[in-house]
Amino acid sequence: MIPSTAAAALLTLTAGVALAHPGCGGQEIGRRNVGGPMVYRRDVTDEASAAASTDVNTECTAYGYAPVTEIASSFPTIWETASILSNDTEGQQLFATINSTLNTKLPNDVPHGTPTGDWTGVNYNSSDPDCWWTHNKCTTPASDTGLEADITIVPEPMTWGLGFDDGPNCSHNALYNLLSENNQKATMFFIGSNVMDWPLQAMRAHDEGHQICVHTWSHQYMTALSNEVVFAELYYTQKAIKAVLGVTPQCWRPPYGDVDNRVRMIAQALNLTTIIWSDDTDDWAAGTDGVTEQDVTDNYQAVIDKAGNGTYTTHGPVVLNHELTNYTMSVFMTMFPKIKSAFSYIVPMCTAYNITQPYLESNVTCPNFETYISGVTNISSSTTQKDGSSSTNTSSSGSGSAAGSASATSSSDDSSSSGSASASSSSSNASSGALGMFDGLSGVGLVLSGVVAGVMLL
């Protein structure tokens, strides 16, 4: 928490460094250097071949997937701050509507600091009128804003809310194998640029029944960004996930937890529920600022110990874990047996809140809590047949729009249900307008043919 002085009406923020998880910027997970010459190429043809190896060097060797050029121009440059594209008329119109409402309802809520988390010289009212999480861990906006409270806990006792930030990670096969072997589903908070970089890994997450949420396009401090950039960071990540997986997420997690009412209002207009956390494992911080791997293990153990001391008799924790590096994934794998032993249930966030329609599309459902704990953890999707009848697929494998439709290239060229926590009349209306922005990409296989200068493996 950024320090405050109770006696001061205005607070001067002098922190010059990121106070949350500064290492969580994406480059640790095989971030590609867009624009450089390709020096590696992995021969993968589909999702299964991408999931076959647990050798990190093999997993994180770049691959190409067609048709790249057909859709690449519909998105911002990967790993650069997103902005609305000049030819994206629908995006521009949707933002104009949202921005008009925002300026009317929250005219005094303005950006804070820099996108890298530097608040030097920033003056902010110590009463926290913007419900700024980074300032005071505020998660419940004032009622007159019309904003939903952030999700921070699981309403079911002795239940661990499982999620992973920063994916998809090119080297996540070992983690996903563990989850699959234990019939364990999670909520995956995906960075848009990572989805573009590693589409087959994103497909695996969705097809194996994990809930997919938004974690912005370029992973920056959102409250430092302009209204337009906040919108673009969320909008294009939704759009990329829709293009790759065929579904439009209705949930998101702000990088570093950095959110305020202005950012919440933009997210809610895109029908995105804000999910924070109650407990941070600090897995992202190992090796920085004096944080050791033992500290991370101790943090996990502290959450586990709460299950034994009565803390979770009325609710459960939402725990911050990361699909960030091999270490952050492996430490979870090590602690998973202890978590299973200590907690009655481990569930994804859609199940925790009985949100049976986790996406804008109504043909994919998430099991509610009662169904999940009975052993039916699979995502169910329905399709309409040519004769007008419908069929239901109750396996954990969904059907993303890119799955099976895009083909690998070997060239070396350069290149909601009523239970939804996000439901509100204002966000619902805006979302109806947002639906059209995805129609043109439905059924198109999104992949990023790699231009790579090298792969950083940590």
Curated annotation (Swiss-Prot):
A molecular function (GO) term: chitin deacetylase activity
Listed GO biological process terms: cell wall organization; chitin catabolic process; fungal-type cell wall biogenesis; polysaccharide catabolic process
Propeptide section residues: 428-458
Chief localisation class: secreted
SUPFAM superfamilies listed in its UniProt record: Glycoside hydrolase/deacetylase
Active-site annotation: 165 (proton acceptor), 322 (proton donor)
GO cellular component: extracellular region; plasma membrane; side of membrane
Identification of the protein by name: Chitin deacetylase 2
Organism expressing this protein natively: Cryptococcus neoformans var. neoformans serotype D (strain B-3501A) (Filobasidiella neoformans)
